[in-house]
Amino acid sequence: MKVAAAPISWGVSEAAGWGYRMAPARVLAEMRQLGFDATELGPPGYLPQDAAARRELLQRHGLRLVAGFLAAVLHDPAFPAATRVTDEAKLLASSGAEVLVLAAAFSGGSYDAGRRLDAGEWKRLARTVREAEDIASGSGLTLAFHPHAGTAVATAEDVRMFLDATHVALCLDTGHIFLGGAEPATIVRTAADRVGHVHLKDVRTAVAARVRSGDVSYTEAVRQGLYASLGQGDLDIEGVYDRLRKAGYQGWFVLEQDTALTVEPAPQEGPAAAARQSLEYFGRIVGVK
């Protein structure tokens, strides 16, 4: 079973003004202490940019790099998406990663001010994503497109349009898919062959409803506990896993619980304790299959 952690579960995000950022050495050490042996990259500059230094840091903590997340403007030709994808692909390939996870950001670096694209912007986005897939493939990587709150592909309708407009693999993030109004299990049932990477998140639906209604921003909802440890929220994580298994999914399961910190947590508390719960829950559902 291919299971990985991600720095976002320790509050490390690329979003502007997200919160307090823990040092890489502590985050990687806690991942390994919990039993993870793989991780995603984290935001630009979080791990060393130098390939040798990055590999040494990961090896020192007994971890391998499996994927990296890039949020780039894909619908506007004024932004050099191809350059950013090329740079990210080279960085990931030099570290032995397998997947480049791409989201369709808006300029500004926030996930709190999304909007719908017009027809011309949609065509540009689809074309740019197809170009990004070619770039990733040229570096030996799989491109997995990530629907995400506050981006150009966020809602259930956006996801449907994306699946119709491209043949690119999907990063199935159970939290963001649900937040956008779709059921993750339904995506697996109708488009299992498109799932190339998985971010497993659990969601507190009462908080999600406040995001959908506009009562709170996405960032504030994360601070209020939008995401729970796996098995502690309201999503049918076991059902999603079961559908993926029956569909023959062979990729990575990245256990995520996006969080935003204000201070350094006590050792093995906060994010580490939450990640431990998720890993134990995932072990239980995998063990009975």
For the regions a language model picked out, list residue spans one by one.
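Conserved, mostly hydrophobic/aromatic
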Residues: 5, 31, 39, 58, ...
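Acidic (Asp/Glu)-rich catalytic clusters
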Residues: 28-33, 47-67, 83-98, 130-138, ...
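Active-site beta-loop-alpha junctions enriched in small/polar residues
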Residues: 8-11, 42-44, 70-75, 105-107, ...
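Non-cysteine beta-strand/loop elements that form the S-adenosyl-L-methionine
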Residues: 2-7, 66, 98-105, 193-206, ...
